[in-house]
């Protein structure tokens, strides 16, 4: 599903999930290969308040990576790594990184990731305060562990726990601002 409302090709779009009002739009984006939390709002000021890196709002992702992610790679991710953005080298801001032991409880992905019998996978939890295009995927690849599956599990204290793909919940503006630590 694409994080847009109008049909563009063969992929499903948000407008097919629910009859949203005309002035509702997504805050940020999820690419077509990513899953998880997406905030939809009619608050035009929220995008800047939430996504501007100087405001330091944490976004946490679970990434299933190819191979067994090492403690050394996690330490590199925490310090920040160099990635390419539109052909220009960019040093990411430091991030929180945790190697997740075991399989996180997540809904099945459709379509499933490619499976290779002799290639192990592992999970890392990355918390960023910036959101460059395909940043998590580029960061994990930069330390030798390409991302196979990517799930945004939270933005600040707003979490997807207990939700299924396609679930839509409605919360008040005050409650949203409180969960997002926006004053």
Over which residues does each language-model region extend?
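RNA pseudouridine synthases
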Residues: 1-183
């Amino acid at each position: 599903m694409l994080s847009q409302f109008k049909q563009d090709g063969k992929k499903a779009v948000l407008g097919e999930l629910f009859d949203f009002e005309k002035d509702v739009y997504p805050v940020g984006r999820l690419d077509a290969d990513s899953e998880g939390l997406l905030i939809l709002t009619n608050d035009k000021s929220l995008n800047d308040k939430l996504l501007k890196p100087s405001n330091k709002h944490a976004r946490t992702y679970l990434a299933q990576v190819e191979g067994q992610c090492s403690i050394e790679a996690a330490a590199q991710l925490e310090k920040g790594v160099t990635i390419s953005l539109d052909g220009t080298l960019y040093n990411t801001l430091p991030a929180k990184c945790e190697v997740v032991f075991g399989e996180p409880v997540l809904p099945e992905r459709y379509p499933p990731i490619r499976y290779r019998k002799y290639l192990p996978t592992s999970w890392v939890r990355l918390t960023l305060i910036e959101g460059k295009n395909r940043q998590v995927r580029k960061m994990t690849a930069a330390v030798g562990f390409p991302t196979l599956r990517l799930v945004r599990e939270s933005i600040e204290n707003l979490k997807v726990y207990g939700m299924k793909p396609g679930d839509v919940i409605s919360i008040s503006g005050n409650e949203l601002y409180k969960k997002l630590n926006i004053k």
